[in-house]
Amino acid sequence: MKEISCGRRTRVSFGKSREPLPIPDLVEIQKSSYRRFLEEGLLEVLKKFSPIYSQATRSDLRKSDRGFALEFVSTRTGEPAIDPLECKAKGLTYSVPIYATARLTDMKSGEMKEEEVFLGYIPYMTDRGTFIINGAERVVVNQIVVSPGLYFSSEYIDREEYGGYFLPSRGAWLEVILDPYDGVLYAGLDGKKVNLFLFLKTIGYEKDEDILSLYPTYLDADDEDSLLLHVGSILLEDIYDGGRKIAEKWDILTKDLAERILMIDDINQIKIVHPIAQNTFEKMLEVVSSSSEEGEEEEEKTKIYGLNEVTVVDAYLEIFRRLRPEELPRINAAKRYLHDLFFNPERYDLSEVGRYKVNERLRNAYIRYLIEVEGEDPEEARKKVYNETSLVLKPLDIVLASRILFDYFERRYVNDFEIDSYELKNLIRIFKEEYLEKRKTAPYDLRKLVSVFRRNYGVTSDLGVFAAIRYVSNINKELPSIPFDTKDHLGNKRVRTVGELVQREFERLFARAQKAIQERLTLINSLSKVSIQSLINIKSIISTVNQFFAMNQLSQFMDQVNPLSELTHKRRVSAVGPGGLRRESKVFEARNVHYSQYGRLCPIETPEGANIGFITSLAIYAKIDEYGFLMTPYRKVVNGKVTDEVVYLRANEEEEYKIIPATTPVDEEGNIIPERVVARMGEDIRLVPKEEVDFMDVSTKQPFSVSASLIPFLEHDDASRALMGSNMQRQAVPLLKTEAPLVGTGMEWEAAKNSGYVILAEHDGIVKEVDAARVVVHRTDENGNLMYDDKGNPVVDEYRLLKFVRSNQDTMINQKPIVNEGDFVKKGDPIADGPATDMGELALGRNILVAFMPWEGYNYEDAILVSQELLEEDVFTSIHIEVYETQARETRLGPEEITADIPNVSKELLKNLDENGIIRVGAYVVSDYGVGSQAILVGKVTPKGEGDTTPEEKIIRSVFGERGRDVKDTSLRLPHGVEGRVIRVDVYDQNDIAELGAGVLKLVRVYVASRKTLDIGDKLAGRHGNKGVVSNILPKEDMPFLPDGTPVQMVLNPLGIPSRMNVGQILETHLGWLAKLTGKWFATPVFEGAKEDEILRPLYEERKKRGLHLGDDENNPNGKVVLRDGRTGEPFDNPVVVGYMYMLKLIHIAKEKIHARSTGPYSLIHQQPLGGKSHFGGQRLGEMEVWALEAYGAAHTLAEMLTIKSDDIKGRNEAYKAILKNMNIPEPGVPESFRVLIKELRGLALDVRLYDENGNEIDIDKY
């Protein structure tokens, strides 16, 4: 065990491994991404569209004839005018002005003019990585999407096809497809399949010889079977016999030639066109050529037929005919259409990351291409790298992708067949003995081949035929099968951070503004008379970018329940959103945990609902590289010795390495102790010699997110319960009295530090002044001497503390100093706690003395029995701040007025209002002063419509003021069920906020703080997914008590543990008691937690010292103790597990959920009561409730509920009158929802009529 520093506290850690890499800034991903956008991204977008010519529509014009050109040189951002707190209070957006230096050039004269122009205001990120949009704090979530690039997959539609598809950042997909049953290569263009060679002709490979040369293969000149199988193939080299040429390049390999080659000793191999390429060529001729040899008696050919018969024009027209059958094929239209699809930078963009991925995927294929096609020396070729830079496709990209398909074709089928199976042996015999002699069809046209075998030899298996061909032709049969690419591998996924998301939006919108700027440029006559600012008016763009922050699916209202929930929200990664997956997607693989997520995305933390697996969290050490790929760090291992060199690897880079976990035993010098160790390699776990190990994890916390790493003994919890524990920590309400966990993981300090709510010292110094709202520190130098400026004044740092600020979820954000005057602080030390922090550590709950035992059924179904002591000591008391606002507007009948002069209101309700009619700060308000009267927060009257006033009325009005005028009381009242103290009142008019809104004269906001103590129905939880609801609050004298008389504070159900398999809570309970008894604070890092014997033996010794060991076994300690019933004093039958567990109060507070309604608002369409507390809605009577009433035969009750209590408008009015007059309630009428149904059916042109029991038609509109 070792001591570690956590904030202003020291913990005893059970961690054994050394961690050479400190935990990084957990919000840096957000901050650096947006910083890059402002510093570089903005200019990148502007440069992309520069220069803008006034005559840009005419691409044939010379530069000097293009009139004027506008280009952007640089950008800069100004300083924010208002600080974040003021923006939140006034409902404004925290933003900065952006400026661009633009240059206008007269292309004719060469004259230039440069000017800095104002582009507008753009939201600015706060120091905590958030945005303030219209007064609300928001977070832009990172999005994970499939990266642009080249991917190979196998698809079964009616049969298997291999395909490589180019996925661009913008533009159409291009697919290169190989149909193994046809033996033909296709190009998938805009969803349609065309012969690949036709497409290659349109992109630069005009001659057939050029195309066929791209696809060579080699035959063993000594292998008779292989040569005979490829009779009919096109030769790609001259063949000599002793210096005499016996065959030329482009000749056909005949049977006679094959037999002659077998007799020549000095030929090792011959180079031919790959049969698939040859077949593709022949199919192209069939498609395009009007003359076909089909149906003619086939003779053995010695020369290639149809070479260059298909022209480039034919190729263009045939492709255009296939893609646009409804249009007349014209060569210019075909050229323009194909160019725009894949080769026009304005329409098609691979993006830099897409080009990087394509180059990476084609690297090996390029080396083979250089060797086989270009004839380069293999050693020299292997040194070369495919380094294309174009962001549109290049012809060689497509050629190399099609060549890769041959590898899939030649390596996969044989592995699917048993080589020694009877069927395969039989097929091989047939091939050798009969078929090779009588061969009449191309070797790779499988459809013909299979039909021949079915007809002649009774073979039914397509795969069997193919496996035999592969085996006999002896091509690459020793090579392993190649796996296809998977979209779920993180090597093929990238993260779009906030900066990129905003930049994409900005780019999309600037493309529109470009046309407007161009139009303005055409109106210029001379440079002297024009202002560049007048040309550039992109306010619409800026306002739409602002709309992105307010409306986009990835810009979310920040989860601000506690510091952890805020931190987690900033580190969230979403697969849904624009360009991502849909929430309704049923694809299990996309949601599942993939092995490549190790150290990059947390396998535990994800929501439980429809978003499960789509929303994840970044792992602690994860980084995002310049392309958006997730990286994780590893320590390098050299010859079995772990070094301190840290290497960051992408998911696809670590595939070939052997990586060992951080828990692997290592001596002090870094040598791995076991000779053989367990290592990861790709998705496999292997036992390898230590000398073969390449890397080691940097930490045991590496795979997990911040939330998951805060769970002690995580390794003893079931994954689904750990998931709940992670999620529920984010729902913990900051408590009035905070307390850090006795049993932590050491991450509490890191989480609090990175949340932005713990104030850290910026420099070394001595605390000079401390009060509730600020801390002043006198700086010191490296030697500890106080620092003074040139004038002899002390150099001080002043830290302002947040006081009683409302969070997005109505919890309280409050900071309090944790240093005293005269304390010495070092840079980075915590000097003030925030919400839910204690001495610089995260403190989401309280350490509670718990007992695991049943108690009178009060802990049935995970319910929790708690002691009155928790209420008396304010253990789970929290403060919640709600804001209420009202506006005084200009109406048609005159202005609304905020006043204390409200008609027909008792003095009791007005006593806390000031002379302006606004409640005073400090007043305690409750929702109900009497029957139906709610506390008034802001007095407001609205004028009613009036006719002409008489002189007498005017006199009355002048004497009595508003009381003499006909006004309506529209005061802001406290909602039902709320009480608290007014802590702040903000009043704004048009002078304070310019954008107050049309017709708004005054805006008043009242902040009410309410104190929520623990109550029955409140939800409590531990950190292990152990959640429950408070069932009863028992006097502490009735609670079970320890041998020394201490009553337990909480009783939990022991049945909640075995089936849930979250045993971590038991170990935490034992260790928590040991911590309490010894006065120590423990840290048990993830996967390095304390062992059972490290806890129970010391715990027994400490309990024995205090006489608390009754019920435990000295030889085999189990941590149990004899408890006595607080009511009778009798001991319970069996010893009970007792200890300290860290419990959280969640934001699901019963008092906020309780709701009742007598009468209230109704829906306009179906006239049924609204639903939910926020709408003051009614209780839904669903179909199951109707069944229950039907089962009891309660016909009248049911009729009443379905009509007058619901949506029978006339009936409910009649019932109301009958109740007032003390009469019988009349028969119910027709529900409004039934009428709506009839109207909808009539809207569908269905004539629906109603008849009574006597056959008379009922007019439904009468009721």
Curated annotation (Swiss-Prot):
GO annotations of cellular component type: DNA-directed RNA polymerase complex
Any one GO biological process: DNA-templated transcription
Catalysed reactions listed for this entry: RNA(n) + a ribonucleoside 5'-triphosphate = RNA(n+1) + diphosphate
Key words, A-Z: DNA-directed RNA polymerase, Nucleotidyltransferase, Transcription, Transferase
Alphabetized CDD domains for the sequence: RNA_pol_B_RPB2
Transcription among keywords: yes
Function: DNA-dependent RNA polymerase catalyzes the transcription of DNA into RNA using the four ribonucleoside triphosphates as substrates.
Protein name stated in the entry: DNA-directed RNA polymerase subunit beta
